[in-house]
Structures are given as C-alpha cells and as structure tokens.
Amino acid sequence: MNQAIDFAQASIDSYKKHGILEDVIHDTSFQPSGILAVEYSSSAPVAMGNTLPTEKARSKPQFQFTFNKQMQKSVPQANAYVPQDDDLFTLVMTDPDAPSKTDHKWSEFCHLVECDLKLLNEATHETSGATEFFASEFNTKGSNTLIEYMGPAPPKGSGPHRYVFLLYKQPKGVDSSKFSKIKDRPNWGYGTPATGVGKWAKENNLQLVASNFFYAETK
C-alpha cells in the first residue's frame, strides 16, 4: 500500500517539478489513478522526465495502464476513478514547448489523439468497484485515431521539449463521434498560444487518470 502512495506522490512531485501540472494538466489537485507505462523499445522507455533521442521516438510507442486503487487514497470518492469493463479511453501526446519553452505560438502541438480504446483484459477484473489492482495493455480494435502519431521533431536550437502522454477515461456511453473536432496540430486548432489538450478534454468531459512524459531536443 505504502509503495503505491509513494509512487503517486513521486508522480505529482515530478509533474510539479517539470511544470506539467501548470502547463498541461491545469489542475493542481490531480492525483493519478495508476501508472501509464510508455515504451518505444526496451532501450527507450518513457520514465517521468527522462530524455530520449528523437530517432528513438519516430514510431508510436506501446502503452500499458496499471490501476492501483491505493494511489487514489487522498482523492474524494466522488472524483475517484472506478474501473468498469465497458470503459473507453483516449490517449494523447502533446508538446507544450512548441516551438520553444519561451515562445508558445504553436503550443500546445498535438502529436497523437487515439480514442475509443478498451482495456485488453477487460473481462479479467471485477466491475463492482472493489477492484484494487490490475495491469492491462489496450485493445485497439474499434479504436478511432483523430490525430495520427507524429514523432518529436523540435526545431534545432530550441532547447529541450516536454512530450506529455495523457490517458483519459471517456464519459460513460460516449464514443469519439461525439467529440469536438481537432482542426489542426498547432494550438490543437484553437488558434491561441499555450492552448491544447486541457481545453479539449474539458469540452468533452474527459477524466484524466494517468500521465507520463519525456524530453527530446535537436541540438
């Protein structure tokens, strides 16, 4: 139990240290419901703020979600994520540092939006809300990619960019056909600097359950 709580706090500390809460999540009360594991290869995992070469991240990575109820210990019950077999998820990758950390004219830049994902082992955990722990990859059958994956390509000399993955639970019974359209990658199509997934997620009533991120730079 304590390990889960410690990991949740370590995640929050990392979000704060690297400006993820302030610049992307926009919710200082956010508590992760589990771990979003992201791996480009065995030698290129995403690890809460590590640095990866851009060439290692050209193809879409593999994802796994590990739910741990104890990570939500300080979350009000009304706001806690309770797993259900029919849950649909949206996976996002966004860059809040486009074209640089001091120039936000393209920020956020949308790199991936994949919706209507299901847990691959959805039938192996309870639906009573008593589930304490499970780990699952995602079933992409029937999923809908709104924005195709684009690997990191920060402008030369623009400094390190944060590439942030976010896992959202979609509202019950709502698939992505009901979501607002993403008109462009820069600013997520809103045309306003420093605008992106937070606004889009709020429009579509998405619940953030986990996040991970890495840095990449073109020197």
Swiss-Prot record:
CDD domains: PEBP_euk
Localization terms from the record: Cytoplasm
Record GO cellular component, one term: cytoplasm
Primary localization class, coarse: cytoplasm
Residue ranges of the TM segments: none
Any Pfam family matching the protein: PBP
Alphabetized SUPFAM superfamilies for the sequence: PEBP-like
GO biological process, one term: regulation of proteolysis
Modified residues (N-acetylmethionine): 1
Keyword annotations: Acetylation, Cytoplasm, Protease inhibitor, Serine protease inhibitor
GO MF annotations, alphabetized: peptidase inhibitor activity; phospholipid binding; serine-type endopeptidase inhibitor activity
Function: Specific and potent inhibitor of carboxypeptidase Y.
Family: Belongs to the phosphatidylethanolamine-binding protein family.
Additional facts recorded: Present with 1030 molecules/cell in log phase SD medium.
Quaternary structure and interacting proteins, as annotated: Monomer.
Name of this chain's protein: Carboxypeptidase Y inhibitor
Gene: TFS1
